């Protein structure tokens, strides 16, 4: 009953309120991730190319993993996380971020180029794919939009509460610990690999357990001098990692019903942190790390959201250097001393990237030039201005894609293009006039007079003689009496009467 009420409230709130904070809160402590097993299965993943950027990156590969979970039909249902993935893809295309390999995990199979459902098993598998066989010069991008949660800290934890990433099947399979996220995605990165991670979920400030963070309250001024601080003395990595999170470890992130007020060209539901971060990417060309970060906070504060985005990194970033999604991080000289010496050594490019050669994709792979994701127009670059997050590495914009194969004991996954169906107009049947039957006059029956029976006189029976009546019987003359004739007698009777 409680679950049904929670589901009903979540659906009604999503449809009525301007934004919803639907937090899961605490979850049971999940089981640990088998990192070795996950890395052994990473080669099974089949990435795609989401779009073709005008200026490809030639210093290495650009791999991206997008995860959006709406938890449809559950008490934890959200409304805009799948939309966040689409919006992030569109934003990266507009700034010409040249993704060469991409996987998309969303709980909507209708999503273009859907890769897999975001279950716990799949999320772990594709996280391993993201960092599998990476080399110096490779660039990684990770985006998660969904639920974050807290769980009681373990015996080996330095915190009272650990943070968790919540997969689609968390109620059966459990969540994913922040300790495991670091072990799986960050710890093994080689020097020269750059990763940018964006978490739009609750309790997300330290989901990667990075050692350096920008520590400042909600009302910090942009006019002050800001620096990263060391927040833990372990979890170092040779890779260069920058993480943007939607809120503090104890905070929550909002799911917005209508995102049109952010000015990004979207109107559907979405995460407030994703909207603010993408707005900063699109509107702060050439700005520094601190400018991008403070703009993200300012957008949310002006719109009345209570969440405070956070910034953390694997190394002490100089916040006043120009922001980029590429290349090594420029470190703050005053904080480098806190890093062990092995993590600050310079790195050399991978031999496969030192002399890039022209490589073309097979003819069977479709990569239409400037084909936008879901029909969003590609940002124009005819004015010659550079786009944030894109670096040509000193090369002309006419460079070609990096090699698709690299000499290694572990072959890199085969590069595969984002499937684009052949351009085809809607079916038009052959032009044909409506059927015109042959012209015919209305049926005219043959002219006939009304039926005239043959003229015939009334029936006249043939005349015939009727039998003549029998002749009257003849009177037989009675014989006279013997004696005298009558006349004679009468003759004498007319005299004198006689006597009787």
Curated annotation (Swiss-Prot):
Database matches in Gene3D superfamilies:
3.40.50.12660
One Pfam annotation, family name?
Peptidase_C14
Class of this enzyme? hydrolase
Q: What is its main location?
A: other
The record's listing under InterPro entries reads: Caspase-like_dom_sf, Metacaspase, Pept_C14_caspase
One biological process term from GO is:
proteolysis
In short, the EC number is 3.4.22.-
Q: Where is this region: Disordered?
A: 358-419, 444-500
Q: Which sites does the entry annotate for glycosylation?
A: 70, 113, 219, 235, 258, 264, 283, 332
Family label: Belongs to the peptidase C14B family.
- The protein's name is Metacaspase-5
Species per Swiss-Prot/TrEMBL record: Trypanosoma brucei brucei
Gene name tied to this protein: MCA5
